[in-house]
Amino acid sequence: MALSALLELSEKEYDAFASVHPYANFLNSIYSGRKFALRGWDVHYVGICRDGEMAAATLLVSVKLHGSYRYFYAPRGFLLDYADHELPQAMCQGVKQFAKERNGLYLKIDPYVTYQEHDQDGKVVEDGFCNQKIVDDLQSCGFAHQGFTRGYDMANQCRWMSVLDLRNKDEETLFQRFDAQTRWAIRRAQRNQIKLTQAGPEKL
C-alpha cells in the first residue's frame, strides 16, 4: 500500500481525522492549535495518506529561537498506528524534513501512548503490557528519549496518568477499587450533597 509524502492539511481536514482517532485529546486538537496561535506560535497541520485515505496526522507548532532558527513541537505526538512500523518511520521522516525546510533546530514529540501498565501503587503489573518497541522505533528515527522522570515539570506534559478500567464493572466494584482516601472524599461529598452537573459551552 502506497504512502504519500507529507501533506499540509487544513484545520478542517485535520479535525475530521483527529476527532475520531484513539490518541486524540485536547492537547493535539485544533483548539490547542488555536491556543498556540494566540500565543504567537506558527501552527501547521500535516499528515500522510495511504491509498488516498488519511493514515497519520499531527498538530505541529513552531516558535522562533535565536536568529532564524525555530523550535518545533508536536503536542502529544503523532496520531497514527504505532504498531504499523511503516507509518511512524514515514511520519518521522516527513516531519523532520518539514521542520528542516523551515530552519527547525529542535523537534519535540511526547506521544499519547501508554508505556507500561502499573497498579495504583505505581508498581509494574506482572504480565501487563509494555510498549518498549514504540520507544525503540522512535529512537531509530533519531529521537532521543528523555528518561522516565517523575513529578511535575512546567516544560513537559505529565508522564504519569491514572486510568480506571470501567469495562464490565458495576458501581460498587468500581468504588471499592478507589484508594481509601478517595472513597472517603466521595462519601463526604455525598453527605454534603455536592453534585456534578454536565454543562455545555453556553453555561461556562
Predicted feature residues:
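N-terminal charged segments
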Residues: 6-51, 56
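Short alpha-helical segments and helix-capping/turn motifs at coil-helix boundaries
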Residues: 30-31, 90-95, 145-148
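Acyltransferase donor/substrate-recognition loop-hinge adjacent to the catalytic core
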Residues: 2-9, 56, 131-204
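Conserved donor-binding loop and adjoining core beta-sheet/short helix segment
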Residues: 35-127
